[in-house]
Amino acid sequence: MKRRKVSFVCSGNTCRSPMAEGIFRSAIKRRKIKFVDAASAGIFAENSKEINEKSAACLTARGIDFSKFHPRQLKHKMIETSFAVICMTRAQKELLNSFDNVYSMDEIAGSEIPDPYGQELSVYQKTAEIIRQAVDKIIDRFFHDEYPRNNSAGNHKK
């Protein structure tokens, strides 16, 4: 089966999209979904050097390894090779509107992901929880037939 990649996009690839990537990877591993991967990038990430320390703290608290993470600039090739590109806001999606595989979190999860940059750790923690809930909706929308459910043997594709 061909591997499918979900790419998460925010502005600088230091706060929201790395949290979304890490939380998504954790969720697909927990649900035993195979042949799906995650990535993240920023629309304006040219000068980004590392993940925001508060975003890192949120991932660490959730037991998510981000040690190999490095912020990167979004490139056309990444969009073209992704199964789905999910932007944190409608405005970010509008910048990429010429691609058919680009969505906003609002379209999938019912709300945008607010930017916690420069705020208290508690705001980052709340953002991480909003992302976790959105990730569940993303998986349910795009991969609902690919993970086993309790007491539902035979009701999913292998």
State what each model feature region is:
Residues A84, M88-K158:
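Phosphate-binding/catalytic loops
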Residues M1-E80, D140-K158:
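Conserved active-site segments centered on acidic
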